[in-house]
Amino acid sequence: MPTYDADFDAESDNNSHSLMVRLVGPDKRVLDVGCATGYLGEALIARGCRVSGVEIDAEAAGRAAKLFDEVLVADLVDVDLVAHFGAGSFDVVVLGDVLEHMVDPDRLLRHVVGLLAPGGSVVISTPNVTHGSLRLALLQGRWRYTDLGLLDRTHVRFFDRRGLLALIEGAGLVATDVRPTTADPLGVEVDVDWPALPPGVIDWVREQPDGQTYQFVVRAVRADADGDLQTMRTRLEELEGELREAREQSAQAQARAERAARDLEAAQHRAGDAEQQLHAVQSTVTWRTLAAPRRVYGLMKGGRRR
């Protein structure tokens, strides 16, 4: 797995790192799994958290160790985190852009539950495989890996909303917060030849559920920690439905506004073309030759009125 590093605005409402920081909360004992150079943990420390980390890359781990209480250099495939850190050692375990790199994310997620103190939570971020850019690219027969992003070449698992929630539930957890980051299907790193797409397809994709969701950021707790699982699941589905409806309405309004803007621009272009053609005709010798008799006729007609 490559080493990732990032600067981010902790106040942003549309950034997975800032959303994770908010879902973790202040003054927590945190394990940052796949901590890289410690950029996320640094923001958590600034909020009063005590942070430990796990990282496979020794150089990145060395940088994080200058900030964290402890950094374990290990491969998540075979490390026993509970044996190393102790059961119930953390208020929050963070899995930021980790699960998609794991051949068996189910096993990892079930394992980290043992690290949670009573009332603890797991905070997860992962890309959305149903983002509109990927839908459009697949319509054109494209699935091209990149160094970063939705099709990071090191991703081995892919999640939509239902798949991610099923993974969480399978680990004995229930999602209490699901927050999307959003990006327009034509505004990300995925290669889409949009002029070649049929009319209306892009707007249709924009309006689909999660068509503009770039990443999911989730907070999950033990299923028995905050009451009945079914009640929480039902309420979560209701909230998700309300959110999707609001986002769909917003996307439809945006699409209508964009279509109106395009129609206006096209009309302005047509008017400009017509004006240029008119000037071109008026500048020809034939037009000037015909214009002189018309002016004389106009003068004569005006004289007769007098």
Where are these regions (language model features)?
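Conserved class I S-adenosyl-L-methionine
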Residues: 28-34
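A short acidic, Gly/Pro-enriched loop at the edge of an enzyme's catalytic core
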Residues: 82-92
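Conserved alpha-helix/loop element of class I SAM-dependent methyltransferases that forms part
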Residues: 11-28
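Conserved acidic residues
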Residues: 28, 69, 91
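S-adenosyl-L-methionine-dependent methyltransferase catalytic module, highlighting the catalytic core
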Residues: 6, 14-15, 39, 59, ...
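Boundary detector for helix-to-coil junctions that initiate low-complexity/charged tails
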Residues: 221-306
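Class I SAM-dependent methyltransferase SAM/SAH-binding core
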Residues: 39, 43-80
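Short catalytic micro-motifs in class I SAM-dependent methyltransferases
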Residues: 96-101
